[in-house]
Amino acid sequence: ASCLVGSEMCIRDSYKAHDVHICIGTGKHLSDKNRLKYAGNEFYFKSQDEMFSLFKQFPEALENTRALTDSVDLQIPMEDYHLPWYTIPGDKKSKDIDEYLKTLCSSGLKDKYENINTEINQRVDYELSVIKKMGFASYFLITADFVEYARKNKIPVGPGRGSAPGSIVSYALGITNIDPLKHNLIFERFLNPDRISMPDIDIDFCVERRGQVIDYLKSIYGEDSVTQIITFGKMNARAVIRDVGRVMSYSYSEVDKIAKMIPEGPKVTLDQALKQNSDLRTVSQTNYKDLIDNAKVLEGMTRHASIHAAGVVVAPGDLTDFVPLYRSSQGDVTTQYDMKELESIGLLKMDFLGLRNLTVIDKTIDLIKQRFNEDIDIDKIDMEDPKVYKLFAKGLTVGIFQFESAGMREFLKKLKPKGIDGLIAMNALYRPGPMQNIDRYIKRAHGKEKVEYVHPLLEEALKETYGIIVYQEQVMQIANIIAGFTLSEADEMRRAIGKKIRSLMDKMADKFVKGAVKNGLSKAKANQIFDLIDKFAQYGFNKSHSVAYSYIAYQTGWLKTHYTAEFMSANLTSEMNNTNKVVVLINECRKLNIKVHAPDINKSGINFEPLNDKEISFGLNAVKNVGVKALEQCIDCLLYTSPSPRDNLP
């Protein structure tokens, strides 16, 4: 025999909050009679002395329990990586994984560049040396393999995402479709040899076929080695007030008033809100004390679990050898560890994101093929088409990826971008924080405000953005040029500033100033430049990501410019479940002199379809409460009774 007690909470004083938590999870109120409830307040984690006191009449059971716990020797290795081993194809000469990666890169570069110069060779050799040193060749080969699978099976893949476009190895392997040298992207922003951590390659796929790529991974590495990742919905300050208030039967108006006293934002805590808001402090000391007290205990706890929208994990063997699994009520299997925890134990996690806009591009290309029998390779379109930039300059960007908000359209009209660099900068600037620099950027771009640099050495890093820090990579360049930092050190400085790690920031500031002085700057000027970096770097955007997403924006803009009816039809079809968005897109069609016909069971199909350059038939699947199967039956009947119902369109 051994001694055990049920432990539902850490300390006895949490029993009231625990009762509230049960009600939140079961959708009950504290006042409900027939609800799940623990008897008493003893279901907490007991101390050693408490256990001895409880079971003092059973000394043998106590000894058995001690022996049992002493025999447990659980060690979870946190330093090792557990990457699945990439199997080199049997017909390949090289059996060394690093050599094989090098061979694939050499082959890929020939497809990407007409002339492979010294700069290209040096960059590739450097990146490969870092990848070899860090032991990540398998990671790149595995990623390249499933991306190649997607492309071969005509599953739309994005040009890149996050910091991965900063790698020429990723470009050579076809993982990304962005030339990092052309856009002055920095490898260390993606993979820092001084900071041992897994590379992070996020991939965008067509939203409708993302699952097919996951199935491919399972077919290669085994069903038991690949699964999706759990994510936990946490109770933040506002949410926990609303949940606790409901369970304690306070009126909606009372709870709503208290919740709105808390500043918005996921990182705002109740303690912070209580310090900032005197009204909330007053409330917490009066009739709502129990509500606030229970909410403070439950704040940050898990409310529910769900499947991460993008996360996939691949293990070198059965996942159960590395991580516990969870089966949802719907039967879906995920890890019990979230993304950060999986990374901490060294498992390979990837983000497979379903991007609607890639589906729109794919559907548009299909419609073009149907109407004109033309094959469009979206990755090979002219990236300097003045007609496309004219569309952006007019602000006609409804339906254009990343550029369709009203505020963005107004800034585009002012900027009038004439090249991809303008789109990249605007994409990075139109975000909270850097948005304050947009007007200044536009004035300088048009020569209405003088471009000035705090020091002439800054021109090299800031010339492309008219002296304004826009990108995180520019912060790294400044540290490299001014203070002599290596790009790895510069990335550490960028991270410290971006994440506001004060101890590391102070250390980096001291090193920056000393390096700048050694480079001939005065201490005052060095401090001035670091203060400038500190001010803007926390808002700086990842240029690699901005470049990749601006490419998608341009591709959608190109399709809208040259195949307007097809593009708008595909966009409308992709948004059929969003009535408000359908209305916005139909209004845009009117501005473009394209008529969207009213739904007509005799003339419409399931999806929106272009009838000609100026007319689109309404997709019946956009009609609420009408299912696809019913529509298919109706259309089959029409096809049976009338071979060409659309021939009668006005």
Each language-model region and where it sits:
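Phosphate/diphosphate-binding loops
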Residues: 31-66, 197-221
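Structural signature of the thiamine diphosphate
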Residues: 60-84, 234
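Noncatalytic, beta-rich nucleic-acid-contacting surfaces in large DNA/RNA-processing enzymes
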Residues: 90-642
